[in-house]
Swiss-Prot record:
Family statement: Belongs to the folliculin family.
Activity control, per UniProt: GTPase-activating activity is inhibited in the folliculin complex (LFC), which stabilizes the GDP-bound state of RagA/RRAGA (or RagB/RRAGB), because Arg-164 is located far from the RagC/RRAGC or RagD/RRAGD nucleotide pocket. Disassembly of the LFC complex upon amino acid restimulation liberates the GTPase-activating activity.
GO cellular component, one term: cilium
Designated name of the protein: Folliculin
Subunit structure as annotated in this protein's UniProt entry: Component of the lysosomal folliculin complex (LFC).
Listed GO MF terms: GTPase activator activity; protein-containing complex binding
Domain of life where this protein originates: Eukaryota
Amino acid sequence: MNAIVALCHFCELHGPRTLFCTEALHSPHPQGASCGDSIGQGEQAEDEEMGIQMSSRIRCHSPAEGASADSNSPRPKKSDMCEGCRSLAAGHPGYISHDKETSIKYVSHQHPNHPQLFSIVRQACVRSLSCEVCPGREGPIFFGDEQHGFVFSHTFFIKDSLARGFQRWYSIIVIMMDRIYLINSWPFLLAKIRGVIDELQGKALKVFEAEQFGCPQRPLRINTAFTPFLHQRNGNAARSLTSLTSDDNLWACLHTSFAWLLKACGCRLTEKLLEGAPTEDTLVQMEKQADLEEECAAREVADGEEGRPRLQPELMEGRELSKCPTESSVLSDCSWNMVQRRMGVFRSLRHMRQVLGASAFRMLAWHVLMGNQVIWKGQDQELIQSAFDVLQAMLPVGCVRVIPYSEKYEDAYRCNFLGLSPQAEIPLHVQSSEFSVMVDVRHANRSNLYPALFVDDEPLSKYEFVVASGSPVTIDKVGLTILNKIEAALSNENLSMDVVDQCLICLKEEWMNKVKVLFKFTKVDSRPKEDTQKLLGILGASEEDNIKLLKFWMTGLSKTYKSHLMSSVRSPTASECRN
């Protein structure tokens, strides 16, 4: 956790002062750390421990040799400090603890060595002991800003028989630049810092009661004659916190507590990547997988009733994939599909665009996005399968219906991706239809028909691709908004295909969100056409092609989403009518 914990004191002579602070150093690491009091015991304890275990390290917190005060340090001069303003003795280098789990070192000094950190801690100290206080001047408070950091401050009093009012004012502050993290840590910090304060107050109270029992100060002050001149009572009003608590190991214990506080607070809250709600593609894939499993289970039951031997799950899965190529082609996690993708000729949309040409690819992509039937006719099944794998990436999973290869023509309602053998006959009305596009894969007459292709694309040099449709797409037409963005990404050579793939996913999610809004607006709420046109204008899809695309993509919504929307949207309306 990137934070600083500091103990501050309001000195009667010098005002707010920082007594002791602990910070976590990630890099650079301080060097020369050694155990001051018991080197052998300290090294043995470090070998046995994993992480920071403060109970066994109180006696051997090592002074940080590399953390000594620099001549250019912004810390106050000795003339501006008294016993109450000073924690570590002159020349004391500070304390350091090493966390083996995270390789973080927790270093404690009286002041931070870095000038910017010193300024931040100094300002937080002044504010915590002057203007930023809670009612009663004792308790927790939160303040800060983006420039100087955010501060959790807990002010408290320590009993002192020689101080004005028999008490001195202190505060423990936690400074962090992450406001949300600090606010979420409020309950934890309050409980742990309150424990440290209670321990300090308990020790000081025992010393105070012992001093009052031996030499009561209240009667002495009452009997003292009043004088208008300022003077320091008893000549020793500025007492150190070590003297007030009668604890010679106070600063080592505070280093222990503050270092543990930084480590524990950093471990209790961790950042997690939230995937959010499942996408429509995920829901559709889950539904298709569930249907496939139900079909397999029903077939097993039927085979068991007829006395047939039950197939092993692996064999059953393989048989289902071979018998149901349409279903298996849309499951991205099928091993069969991944093998075909690796062996395919077309590697990506950009590769296909380079092979077919910009105008032919635009026509083909337009028909794919609009839901028209895409027919590939040729002898090479691997080539056709790879083309379908690449093209269907532009569509939601629910809109994809594939027949990879067939000896006869299949109607458009059965599939929008159809692979045919060269001997298959295509009806004339399909060839002239504006709702279909055909790619005829022929053997090329010359081996160098595509000289722009790479050397490793030898299979493509054997073919000539003829793209034809009854509704050609003109280049000067504005067309589909999503198609224009896809072509812009594909034509930008500065973008790798990994970036283009992520761009394509974002574009599909953007337009699927528009589909969801339109579905709720028209199918669930049954709004009139005038309101629907206004909505389409707001969505940026008022053009005819975009409207057709939204209607086609609406068929790709999952059954789960549709049923959930129909059940959850209408219930509030019914309750409002009852009220």
